[in-house]
């Protein structure tokens, strides 16, 4: 029996959520369609009813994940709140649920230019949020500083996940968090 339109919509959402998580945890190229469908609790045969290809799935899943981050509660608070959340041991440990750019940056950079539009839009959105936080704190928006702050956040998360020294990993997060929030 064919799923109802509502079931099909729910299935598609589960596929997108599962793919976004698995891609961020393992990398796009390391995750196959079978793993995504199994993780979503669906059969492989249903995949092509939702997506043209794995590339189509990757593009949509990553856009979905990045859009969810820009709409997240963390972005509705203050810069200090965002820094505490983004530059935290919990976020560091949760690559599958965290920042797509920090989890997949080098892999995203190797995507064809035509497929990097959602990533570019996401980064522009993060920069805009940084500029908005500058305004909220009484400062004049400084795009250059906003770009540097976004790069600092992403870079700190990447480095903290890369090193094999837990104390250094924590120090990286804390140093950038303190610098960005003015607590240094």
Annotate each predicted stretch with a short phrase.
Residues 1-8:
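N-terminal intrinsically disordered/low-complexity leader segments
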Residues 4, 23, 32-33, 44, ...:
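Amphipathic alpha-helical segments enriched in hydrophobic/aromatic and basic residues
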Residues 14, 18-56:
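Helix-turn-helix
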Residues 16, 124-131, 143:
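An amphipathic alpha-helix signature
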Residues 17, 80-92, 106, 147, ...:
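Amphipathic alpha-helical segments that line or abut small-molecule/effector binding pockets
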Residues 70-98, 136:
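Hydrophobic alpha-helical connector segments
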Residues 81, 93-120:
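Amphipathic alpha-helical segments used for helix-helix packing
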Residues 112-121, 134-184:
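Hydrophobic/aromatic-rich alpha-helical bundle segments in the mid-to-C-terminal region
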């Amino acid at each position: 029996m064919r799923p109802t339109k509502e079931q099909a919509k729910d299935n598609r959402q589960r596929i997108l959520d599962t793919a976004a998580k698995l891609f961020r945890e393992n990398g796009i190229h390391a995750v196959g369609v079978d793993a995504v469908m199994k993780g979503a609790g669906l059969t492989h045969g249903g995949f092509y009813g939702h997506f043209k290809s794995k590339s189509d799935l990757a593009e949509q899943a990553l856009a979905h994940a990045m859009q969810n981050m820009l709409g997240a509660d963390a972005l509705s608070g203050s810069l200090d709140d965002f820094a505490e959340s983004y530059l935290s041991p919990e976020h560091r440990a949760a690559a599958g649920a965290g920042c797509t750019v920090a989890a997949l940056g080098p892999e995203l950079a190797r995507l064809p230019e035509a497929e990097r539009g959602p990533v570019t839009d996401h980064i522009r959105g993060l920069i805009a949020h940084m500029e908005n936080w500058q305004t909220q704190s009484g400062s004049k928006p400084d795009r250059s500083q906003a770009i540097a702050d976004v790069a600092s956040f992403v870079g700190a998360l990447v480095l903290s996940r890369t090193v094999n020294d837990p104390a250094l990993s924590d120090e990286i997060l804390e140093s950038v968090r303190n610098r960005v929030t003015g607590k240094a």
